[in-house]
Structure formats: structure tokens, C-alpha cells
Amino acid sequence: MSKTEHPASGASPETRAAALRATLNRYAHEYYVLDQPSVPDAEYDRLYRELEALEAEHPELRTPDSPTLRVGGAVLPEFAPVRHVVPMLSIRTETDTTAGGALDFDASVRRELGLAESDPPVEYAAELKFDGLAINLRYEKGFLVQAATRGDGATGEDVTQNIRTIRQIPLGLRPVGGAVPDVLEVRGEVYMRRDDFERLNARQRERGDKTFVNPRNTAAGAVRQLDPKMAAERPLSFFAYGLGEAAGWSGMPDTHSGMLDALVAYGFPVSKERAAVKGGEGLVQFHAAIGAKRDSLPFDIDGVVYKVNSLALQRELGFRTREPRWAVAHKYPAQEALTTVESIGVQVGRTGAITPVARLVPVFVGGVTVTNATLHNEDEVRRKDVRVGDTVIVRRAGDVIPEVVAVVLERRPMEDVPGSDLFNPTQQPKHPPFELPRSCPVCGSHVVREEGEAVARCSGGLFCSAQRKEAIRHFAGRRMMDIEGLGERYIDNLVELEYVHGIADLYRLTLDDFLEMKRRADERDGVTPETVAAGKIATKWAENLLDGIRASKTPPLARFLFAMGIRHVGESTAKTLADWLGSLAIVRRAPAPLLLTLPDVGATVAEAIADFFAEPKNQQALDALLTAGVAPQGEHPPSAKLRDQLEPAELYAALGVPKLTAIRSKQLATLVPSLAQLANVDTAQLEGLPADVAASLLAWLDADDHRTRLGTLDALRAELLAAMPAGAAEEGALSGKTVVLTGTLPTLSRDEAKAMLEAAGAKVSGSVSKKTDYVVAGVEAGSKLARAQELGVRVLDEAGMLALLQNPPGDSA
């Protein structure tokens, strides 16, 4: 290769630098001005680093329009320009996303300060790097007079009227010590919480309007709305994190963390996810702690930021070109990346859901190599117009299944339309739009999509081997039946080699079945295990599997219900069914109106549960499990809390009779005080109701055998009332108490301990606060234990927790 060629492209350094500048400036315009980025941040950062390295090697190539000499985007002409008194400079981003990035920054600071290895560690303020729009708020004599965007760092845009609509931002400062600074510029980030973003998009869909791509762009677009009323409709939030100009501030703090505390006192929201830490190791720990929780934060972050805490040391360290030496942004592995769609297929889920899946050129994103990404459903594929050959943005966060966020349309493969020529060039996409298959790719059954459903489904049921596999995987899962050792490979072989046709078949398997299955699978795959080659047969794995299956026969009722794979029934709803109805026999017989009276059970869920247990094939599958020896544990009489839900007015309201509102249901209950009477009611008995309501009720009673069903519901109601404990609704022994679990317990799993505490009425929380009553600590308890000790919260070990459950507070036993 010639010395004049650049290795990334084979072009000369001058040509490559010009191409990079043009591309980066276009991407920056899309991101900062149009609020419509076409590529993820990681792609921009990669090209930026390439240009930065090229200009360092060839300084003569740096031009005035190089993005390496700028901070952000251009000023929008519709807003008045604002010159920043103190420039809003960006900070350097550490590209090493490992612990080494934090240690390198600490080493750099110590070098700049001339510190020896024996000198004390430097104290840093560690905080979040928010993913929103940077804003400068100017207060004079305690009142907000101006709000401006970062712009290019020197000049921003006046967005005061829009910022005033954000309720978190104070219009006036709270006096501290009876005074406020003469001038105070507070810098921070306008952002949008994830839940607010989801609600906003839900409203957009209801109106038939275009939905937004992500919270960051939505927040930025709202701030730049010319009409403040439109900006006010967007649910924006704000965090303060720094200062611009400050004058006439007596008692100004001498540390960054002290300054943030002062901003809280003045009335600004400051993120609680911050800490003052010592040295590089403290930075490493903060980076790891935030990394572990970032996907559970209610807002998006773009990494963390480290700042030398001492403001005096910040001044001593100063700046290099466009960045402070005393601060750095430390990112995490990119959650978005570019790749190419090789093909689009479908997966069949346990309920028959047909999910389109993009098969991708492997790409490293979110800390793992991703080869597949969900496209959710047919409508989503059409909306995004994902096609084979497209360059797409793929996102992966935490344990969430990777998804295709958007298509980079400018990179779509195109071809000439037949008949076009040099004078009439016409192009079209090389690949056609995706079409959902009309038959299941696994079993050949029809694919159907019911009216109002977003998801298409295979109609094959358990005849479809894909649905059988997924149903067994769900059933055997850790939070369901928890069958130890029954992994994906064994399930695939059991179904494919016809050993398991229904879930109950698991409990009829023998040692010989497993050994024969393994032999047949090895023959099919052309594998000869070492033990077989040596003339031996390994049996321990099969014995362990049988032990795991046998051990799963006595699950708690809630876990058994969750394991059944009822549509719309998750872990929480299964627990509600078990807690309130008490037994499998009652749950199986409960009609939709009764289920609808339970907490957090809506009409769709109630119908799904009732339909599941009314389906003959599901009844047969359930009976087969019970016959095979599966026996749910922890059954009890119906909860006394159910008594109020069984009042006729409550049940009438749950019947789904048109025009029979909750108020009219109470009125009906005074006229017709029992379900049995309602089943035989006539017009004369309904004279107290409005005529249209009475007519609607009589029409409902005459349709679909509703009178007979009312009689059945009335009999079940009487049975439940007779079976439940006498007296008022009972409370758990730990009702009203908040408990936090941390560390590894000696004999109980986290889920088991949580279930025991919740059964006693306790609320199990994930964080320690002043409202926490107990912390149950095991091995390697960590920061939650330290926080509990700091707050004086009572700490128990496993034995102490069990003793508490046996003898709760106020128990005389």
C-alpha cells in the first residue's frame, strides 16, 4: 500500500478526510438540526474517531468546518441566537468501555497534577451522562430570564418559552440562607422518561398520528417547537448537572458534588444516581454499578461522567482545545449498531404467534454478538418497511430481545427498472416487501389473524411441533415448574423424536426412554460420544433429569397456573388467582364475570382464563398432569377478601351487559338481590331501571344461554361464601411491612424467599430506603446491606426471616 493511501479506504488522506467531514457534518445536521438521525451514535463515534486520528497524523488537513473543532449543531434560524457567556463545551468520550477506561482517566489526571504513586487518591464526582438535550438556564436576581440550547457551544438558541413549560424547572430560585446569587447559569439536560414516551406514543396511535422514534429525539423536538403550547403537550423532564456563569454567590461550594447539593437546595432536580468516589477503583465500581442497573432506570443514559471533584483542581487542570482535562464521559457497549438483513423468516411461539425475525450479518451490540432481531409482527414490518439487503439499526438493551429499530433507506439496494435508460433513469428497490406466510412453516397449518389482533397465529395447536416445544420450555422454566436440567436440546429431541406429545408425557418418561432418545439423536446427528466409543453407556445425566422431573411434581399453585401458559396470564396474575380463589378446582370453574372482579384482571384476561379452562383439550391436558402425579401445593379456602367482590352489584357490573354501568348495577341489586332471581327476571321487576337499560338487560338474558350461566355463577358464589373463613378480610402477618432481599441465602432461592414473604403480606422491594422495615441478607450482600446499616434498618439472616414468619410483630405466640 502506498504511504499516501489511507488504510480505511485505500484513498489518499486528503480525500478520506474530506469524505469523513462531509459524512459527519451530514449526520450532525440530521441529529442536531432535523432531530432525525439516520445512524446510531456508535456509527457517528466510529467515523469521528477515524477523522480525529487522521487529522492528528496530518494537521494540515484540519479545516474550519471540521466537526473535530465543533461541539454541536447549527442554530435554527427560527429562534433568536444566544451567545453563551461561558462556552458550553463538550467533554471527551472514553472509547474503552471496560474498567480500563476509568483507570486510564485517573492515571491521566494524576500525571497532569504531578502526583506520585504514594500520594492520596484523587476524589471524583461520578454521575450519569443523560441522553437528551443540553440546556443553559440563566437566572438573574433569582428569576429565570433565559433558556438556551447548547448550539455550537458558543452560540445557542433562545428556547425560554418552551422551557418554561417544564414543571421541574423552577421559574424562581429558592433562597438559601435568605439569599440567591445575582447571576446563576444552571446547565442540565432536558429528557423524556421511557414511560412518558410510551404513553405519548399510545396517544399518537389513538389519534392516528405518526409515532416518535425514541425519547431523545422527541425531547429535542419538543424544546425546538415554535409553538410553546405544542411543547407543553410533551411530557418533558429535567436534571441539572453543572454551572455556567455565576456571580454574587456568597458561600459558593468548592467541590462539584457540593455544587450539585446547592442546586438541589435552590430547587433544581438533580439525579440521585451520583457519588463522590476515591481514585480509579472508585470510578470502576461506579461504572459497574450503573451498568448493572441502567436498563432498569426510568430514562435513557449515554454512559457515565467522571469529574475531578475539587473546583480548584479543575481550574489547575484546565482545558485542551475543546475539552476539559478534568472530566471524561465513559460509555458502555453500544446498544445500537448498523448491520445488514440477510433474510427474513418467522418463529412460531407457544401460543402459535407467528413472529417475523430478521437474520442479520453478525454485529456486536449491547455486549454480545447479535445474529437475529425481532420484527414483532406483520404490521410492524410494513410500518418500518424492512426488506432483505437493507442496512438497519439494531438495538439490544440488557436481556431484551434485539429488535430492528429503523431502516437506513439511503443504503437500500436498488436496481434499474426494465426499460429505463440514460435519459430516463428509473430505479426500484432490489427486494420486494416482506409477506407473512399463509401456512405455518413448521406444520403447514393455516396462519390466521383474528380481527383486532396484531399477531397472526398458526392454527395447528399442539399438533404443531414448534408450539409443543415452546409450551414445554415455558412449562419447565425456572419460575414455572423449575425442572432442573431440562434444557432446550433435550426438549427439541423429545418432541422431534416423538417421545413427548403433551406436557404430561414428561412425567411418564423412563430411564430407558432417555437413553434411547440420546442414542437416536446421536445417530441422526452423526455423533459418537466418547463413552459409547469406549463401550460404555453414560446414565447419570438421564438419572438427574428424571430426578428433576420428579421434584417438579409439587409446585406452589401460583407457579403451576403460570406454567400452564394461559394467554395474558403472567406471574402476577397467576399469583392473584391462587391467593384469591385458593384452589385449582375453583380456578378451573371460575367464569369470566367472577374473574373480572379480581384485582388487576381486566375483561381480556378474564375471558382468556375462562376460555382456556373451558377448552376440552386443555381440560384433558390438565387432567393428564394430575393423573401423572402433579399436585399443586399451598391450596387454601377462598380468601375472605373475595367476600366484597361477590356482592351482587359487583357481579352484575362484571357481566358485560350493554348500558349496565356500575351505578345501574347497584340500582339493579336493590331490585333483584340475587343472581338466581336475575336469571328468571321479567319486565315488571325492572321497572325501577331506565327503559333502555332494562331492554338491554332483557335482550342480553335471552342471548347465548345467559340465564343458565347466571344460575351456575350463583351456585359457585354460594359455594365460595360457604368455604371462605368467617369474619372480615384477613391480612397477612407482615401486611404493611416492606422487606428487601440481598445476597445469597443458605437454603432458599431468592424467588422462594420472596414468595414466602409475599404470602405473609409483605411488600418485597428492590431498594433500601427509610421506609424499609427489614433487610434479609445472605452471602455477598453488598451495598444494600451497607445502606440498611447506615439507615438503621433491622437486618435479618435466613433463620431470622423464618423466625419472623413464624412469630410476626405483635404475635403473642
From Swiss-Prot:
Q: What SUPFAM superfamilies does the database record attribute to this sequence?
A: BRCT domain, DNA ligase/mRNA capping enzyme, catalytic domain, Nucleic acid-binding proteins, RuvA domain 2-like
The residue ranges of the BRCT domain are 729-813
Give the CC-aspect GO terms: cytosol
Enzyme Commission number(s) of this protein: 6.5.1.2
Is NAD among the key words of this record? yes
GO molecular function terms noted in the UniProt entry: DNA binding; DNA ligase (NAD+) activity; metal ion binding
Known catalytic reactions: NAD(+) + (deoxyribonucleotide)n-3'-hydroxyl + 5'-phospho-(deoxyribonucleotide)m = (deoxyribonucleotide)n+m + AMP + beta-nicotinamide D-nucleotide
Tell me a GO biological process for this protein: DNA repair
Positions contributing to NAD(+) binding: 41-45, 90-91, 127, 150, 189, 307, 331
List residues binding Zn(2+): 440, 443, 458, 464
Q: Which domain of life does the UniProt lineage start with?
A: Bacteria
What does the protein in this record do? DNA ligase that catalyzes the formation of phosphodiester linkages between 5'-phosphoryl and 3'-hydroxyl groups in double-stranded DNA using NAD as a coenzyme and as the energy source for the reaction. It is essential for DNA replication and repair of damaged DNA.
User: Hey, which family's this protein in?
Assistant: Belongs to the NAD-dependent DNA ligase family. LigA subfamily.
Q: Spell out the protein name for this chain.
A: DNA ligase
What is the originating organism of this protein? Ralstonia nicotianae (strain ATCC BAA-1114 / GMI1000)
Q: Which gene encodes it?
A: ligA
